């Protein structure tokens, strides 16, 4: 089949892992000769990379898909793909709901997109949701940025939080080898990328599934050692990582982050609830006291560290007193960013079957109250930036003001300042902060730090 001047469009829902998967699948499509189309209505292949963490994200997918399914009646050569977590969860049921679909593929099959599409082009309707070993990516991803990049270090999750569908749809933990991770990072350094975010659903579990143990009996490979191993990759100026689990977040890792200058002093560590009974019901494997000790240890080693987190309100059986324990934790810690959600029952999870579900009214009320407090604390934390000089990695032009560029501080705060994107993109610029807002900063450029050439 010829693919000259044929176009594709990918719409991505959900987490950073999905965004990284979409970049890899875009790379596969471009290797096959397809060109990107910003407008899905001009595309010959439309791929929805989906999220099932909450019901509203899942329903949005069906809304988008319905519009394109109607289009296919007039354009039968249109290829429709649902990838990601909804595809994995629903499998062949998706074909019954949307018979116009050509390909349903779970996240473990992202690197197999070419083979799956070739089967579709041969006239088959394909479902690929079986559990497989994730093959190393042999295709260069089409990355959305030329400055920052995602690098997967571990796929899947072995945790069994009672509210979470991720282990069901992303499979068991599969760690990449340190050499494969470093090789990808070295190539990114040669291409001029400056910042890499190492990704995993539970990144602190890295290496547990790889062979080998030390003489002391611990796993031969672990995430802390990986940070030391990749820290000196030429050309890479910054390292971030996500997402962490409090159960596995160690003082040794904290110490490494404090010692390694390229590691950004920003930590995303979900706590989900500030109440121990709820944490036990969620099967999170830690207490709020342990979570607080982790944050205290981070701030002891790195007093100015930026901390972000996730929290759930309205978990089955949550009492007002238990919810207030979550409010107290947020008040006491003071997060730099707080992602919140009302509990959403997900198919195949234990908590979805419990008979102590809360009303939507209670969940909505608690979500509003938590957001109000969280935003107040974020605004308080932002005030410390005023008048300081922060180093900002310039990523792009401010879409709302063409005279400004934008980037992020070491602590992951979005920052705007005057400048020419053609001169500054990918540069580290010292910026004096002159205006603070809860979620962003504005400043004046002071000095451009010249990166060491690769």
From Swiss-Prot:
Enzyme class, first EC level, given as a word: transferase
Residues given in the record as [4Fe-4S] cluster 2 binding sites: 157, 161, 164
Cofactor dependency: [4Fe-4S] cluster
Range of residues in the leader sequence: none
One GO-annotated biological process of the protein: tRNA methylthiolation
Domain TRAM: 383-447
Transmembrane segments: none
GO MF, any single term: methylthiotransferase activity
Complexes and interactors: Monomer.
Family the UniProt entry places it in: Belongs to the methylthiotransferase family. MiaB subfamily.
Protein name (record): tRNA-2-methylthio-N(6)-dimethylallyladenosine synthase
Organism: Nostoc punctiforme (strain ATCC 29133 / PCC 73102)
Name of the coding gene: miaB
């Amino acid at each position: 089949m010829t693919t000259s001047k044929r176009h594709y469009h990918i719409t991505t829902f959900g987490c950073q892992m999905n965004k990284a998967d979409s970049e890899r699948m875009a790379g596969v499509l471009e290797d096959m000769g397809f060109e990107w189309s910003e407008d899905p209505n001009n595309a010959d292949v439309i791929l929805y990379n989906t999220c099932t963490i909450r019901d509203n994200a899942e329903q949005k997918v069906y809304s988008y898909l319905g519009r394109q399914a109607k289009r296919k009646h007039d354009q039968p050569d249109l290829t429709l793909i649902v990838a990601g977590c909804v595809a994995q969860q629903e499998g062949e049921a998706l074909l019954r709901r949307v018979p116009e679909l050509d390909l349903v593929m779970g996240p473990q099959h992202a690197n197999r997109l070419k083979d799956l599409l070739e089967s579709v082009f041969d006239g088959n309707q394909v479902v690929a949701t079986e559990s497989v070993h994730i093959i190393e990516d042999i295709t260069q991803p089409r990355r959305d940025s030329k400055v920052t990049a995602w690098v997967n270090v571990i796929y899947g999750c072995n945790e069994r939080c009672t509210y979470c569908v991720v282990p069901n749809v992303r499979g068991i933990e599969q760690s990449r080898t340190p050499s494969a991770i470093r090789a990808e990072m070295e190539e990114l350094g040669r291409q001029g990328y400056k910042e890499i975010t190492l990704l995993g659903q539970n990144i602190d579990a890295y290496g547990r599934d790889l062979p080998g143990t030390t003489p002391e009996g611990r796993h031969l490979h672990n995430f802390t050692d990986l940070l030391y191993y990749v820290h000196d990759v030429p050309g890479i100026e910054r390292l971030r990582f996500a997402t962490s689990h409090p159960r596995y977040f160690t003082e040794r890792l904290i110490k490494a982050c404090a010692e390694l200058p390229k590691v950004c002093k920003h930590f995303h560590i979900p706590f989900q609830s500030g109440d121990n009974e709820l944490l036990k019901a969620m099967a999170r494997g830690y207490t709020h006291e342990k979570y607080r000790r982790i944050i205290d240890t981070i701030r002891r080693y790195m007093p100015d560290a930026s901390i972000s987190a996730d929290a759930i309100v309205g978990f089955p059986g949550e009492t007002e007193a238990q919810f207030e324990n979550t409010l107290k934790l947020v008040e006491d810690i003071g997060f730099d960013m707080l992602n919140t959600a009302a509990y959403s029952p997900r198919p195949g999870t234990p908590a979805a079957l419990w008979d102590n579900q809360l009303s939507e009214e209670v969940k909505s009320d608690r979500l509003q109250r938590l957001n109000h407090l969280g935003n107040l604390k974020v605004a308080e934390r932002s005030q410390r930036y005023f008048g300081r000089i922060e180093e900002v990695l310039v990523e792009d032009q401010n879409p709302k003001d063409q005279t400004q560029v934008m980037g992020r501080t070491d602590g992951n705060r979005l920052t705007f300042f005057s400048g020419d994107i053609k001169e500054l993109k990918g540069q580290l610029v010292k910026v004096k902060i002159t205006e603070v807002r809860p979620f962003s900063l504005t400043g004046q450029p002071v000095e451009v730090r010249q990166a060491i050439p690769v």
